[in-house]
Amino acid sequence: MRTLWIMAVLLLGVDGSLVQLWKMIFQETGKEAAKNYGLYGCNCGVGRRGKPKDATDSCCYVHKCCYKKVTGCDPKMDSYSYSWKNKAIVCGEKNPPCLKQVCECDKAVAICLRENLGTYNKKYTIYPKPFCKKADTC
């Protein structure tokens, strides 16, 4: 499993907000993001897109749509500030508008993944991209 995690880090990169996103997901779900969601379903992970397989995968689909609305920065590379207070994610007030949007997108997916932990299905953990059907546009 450690090898899978290392491969996911190398494939996905760890700059900017990806590290923050992974931390948020861990804080909300208790799951390591790269290992559990890096290639989950048709939408979780970089470069994946398709009709969601379940509610967990739908969280990632909505997250990708949220990122598409962000302008003025790179959601995957630019860092923002946030804190974990009383078991809640709080996006930093001093973030520029673009990074505030990115933080809110990441916060929403982390909460969505926590709320849908019951739908997490190990059979979708490393789901083959060719099995994904075309998704509706955001």
UniProtKB/Swiss-Prot annotation:
GO terms for biological process: arachidonate secretion; lipid catabolic process; negative regulation of T cell proliferation; phospholipid metabolic process. Disulfide bonds join C42-C132, C44-C60, C59-C112, C65-C138, C66-C105, C73-C98, C91-C103. Its EC number is 3.1.1.4. The active site is at H63, D106. It is found in: Secreted. Binds 1 Ca(2+) ion. It is an enzyme of class 3 (hydrolase). One of its GO terms (cellular component) is extracellular region. GO terms for molecular function: calcium ion binding; calcium-dependent phospholipase A2 activity; phospholipid binding; toxin activity. InterPro entries: PLipase_A2 (IPR001211), PLipase_A2_Asp_AS (IPR033112), PLipase_A2_dom (IPR016090), PLipase_A2_dom_sf (IPR036444), PLipase_A2_His_AS (IPR033113). The keyword RNA-binding does not apply. Keywords: Disulfide bond, Hydrolase, Lipid degradation, Lipid metabolism, Metal-binding, Myotoxin, Secreted, Signal, Toxin. Its cofactor is Ca(2+). It catalyses: a 1,2-diacyl-sn-glycero-3-phosphocholine + H2O = a 1-acyl-sn-glycero-3-phosphocholine + a fatty acid + H(+). Pfam families: Phospholip_A2_1 (PF00068). Belongs to the phospholipase A2 family. Group II subfamily. K49 sub-subfamily. Is abundantly expressed in Tokunoshima and Amami-Oshima P.flavoviridis venom, but is missing in Okinawa P.flavoviridis venom. It is thought that loss of BP-I in Okinawa P.flavoviridis is due to lack of necessity for a strong toxicity exerted by BP-I in the venom as far as they feed mostly on frogs. PANTHER family: PHOSPHOLIPASE A2 FAMILY MEMBER, PHOSPHOLIPASE A2, MEMBRANE ASSOCIATED. Snake venom phospholipase A2 (PLA2) that has strong myotoxic activity with a low phospholipase A2 activity. PLA2 catalyzes the calcium-dependent hydrolysis of the 2-acyl groups in 3-sn-phosphoglycerides. This is Basic phospholipase A2 BP-I. It comes from Protobothrops flavoviridis.
